[in-house]
């Protein structure tokens, strides 16, 4: 969503999946991450950042209900075990930017925005409360065409869920809709 700050005029529609909610502790996290980067090193793994952020969990069951997809993730040699300090800093910086309303130019207020999330993805989306906050923030920025859909019995990676055909059908319908 930070891309919208200066580039919403460059896109016709915006699709969000597994829509991330704003973390109220992001400003504090940024200060801690800055401290860790300076004193431990950007490429190191700070245990306190890992603990506070939750980034680097080995349990991947929050991703999807599809056990085959989780097995693929667990067997993928390219999956990182956790984020280094600069990685956590980047995530918290992006999260912090979600609420910096004054930085959004909102040059395309009629931009159609569709958010597709799993109802069981409370950790990332913040659940109904987090999604409502996201919608209200987008509206405060100036966007008028925001549709938030939660799919029951789905987790974070709705594109990799067991019933993902429902997601793909909704995506196709969104992009085929006329303005």
Show the residue positions of the predicted features.
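Alpha/beta-hydrolase-fold enzymes
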Residues: 2-83
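Short, conserved loop/helix-junction motifs that constitute active-site signature segments
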Residues: 8-9, 104-109, 141-143
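Short, solvent-exposed loop/turn segments at secondary-structure boundaries
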Residues: 27, 125-128, 160-163
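Active-site nucleophile elbow and catalytic-triad environment of alpha/beta-hydrolase enzymes
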Residues: 84-105
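Conserved alpha/beta-hydrolase "acid-adjacent" motif
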Residues: 111, 120-133
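Short beta-strand/loop motif that positions the catalytic acidic residue
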Residues: 115-117
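A general structural detector for well-ordered alpha-helical segments in enzyme core domains, enriched
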Residues: 130-137, 167
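Catalytic active-site module of serine/aspartate enzymes centered on a nucleophile-bearing elbow/loop
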Residues: 139-179
């Amino acid at each position: 969503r930070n891309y919208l700050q200066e580039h919403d005029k460059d896109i016709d529609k915006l699709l969000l999946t597994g829509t991330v909610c704003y973390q109220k502790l992001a400003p504090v996290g940024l200060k801690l991450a800055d401290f860790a980067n300076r004193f431990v090193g950007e490429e190191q793994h700070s245990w306190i950042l890992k603990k506070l952020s939750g980034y680097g969990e080995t349990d991947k069951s929050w991703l999807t209900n599809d056990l085959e997809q989780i097995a693929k993730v667990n067997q993928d040699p390219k999956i990182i075990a956790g984020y280094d300090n600069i990685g956590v800093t980047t995530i918290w910086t992006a999260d912090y930017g979600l609420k910096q309303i004054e930085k959004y130019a909102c040059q395309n207020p009629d931009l159609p925005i569709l958010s597709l999330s799993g109802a069981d993805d409370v950790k990332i989306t913040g659940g109904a409360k987090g999604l409502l906050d996201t919608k209200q923030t987008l509206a405060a920025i100036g966007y008028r065409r925001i549709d938030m859909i939660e799919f029951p019995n789905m987790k974070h990676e709705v594109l990799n869920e067991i019933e993902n055909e429902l997601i793909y059908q909704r995506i196709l319908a969104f992009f085929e809709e006329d303005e």
